[in-house]
Amino acid sequence: MKGKRIAIVSHRILNQNSVVNGLERAEGAFNEVVEILLKNNYGIIQLPCPELIYLGIDREGKTKEEYDTKEYRELCKKLLEPIIKYLQEYKKDNYKFILIGIENSTTCDIFKNRGILMEEFFKEVEKLNIIIKAIEYPKNEKDYNKFVKTLEKMIK
């Protein structure tokens, strides 16, 4: 029996090893987020990390403006192609989706200053009329408990 619920997560939700050195907030994954999703029978699709592919593991932090190049956007679009195909297929079978981004990320912010990967992601999702609930992992630890409560309500 399929739960028909998919969480699309920013790469660093499952892998903090991909973060710019010194900005990581966990040793591996954000375990509690993963546990909440699994406990509620969500499948998980991990978005790619274009920053890691584009500049490598030892990169320095950059602003959105520095990443906002034709080359970087094309990389994001290419990396998203299989993800969008997955969503198209799941949509045919009436799956429900949530998206977990990263607040204040030049690539994965969803709401305040949408990151470049998310801009390209939402362009494709909107073309396909796919409905996705979204939430961001907070930048500040003081907002973490509110995030967890909101996530738990959102996925029930």
Swiss-Prot record:
Report what the protein is called.
Uncharacterized protein MJ0003
Its source organism is Methanocaldococcus jannaschii (strain ATCC 43067 / DSM 2661 / JAL-1 / JCM 10045 / NBRC 100440) (Methanococcus jannaschii)
Give the matching NCBIfam families: TudS_rel_CD3072
Superkingdom: Archaea
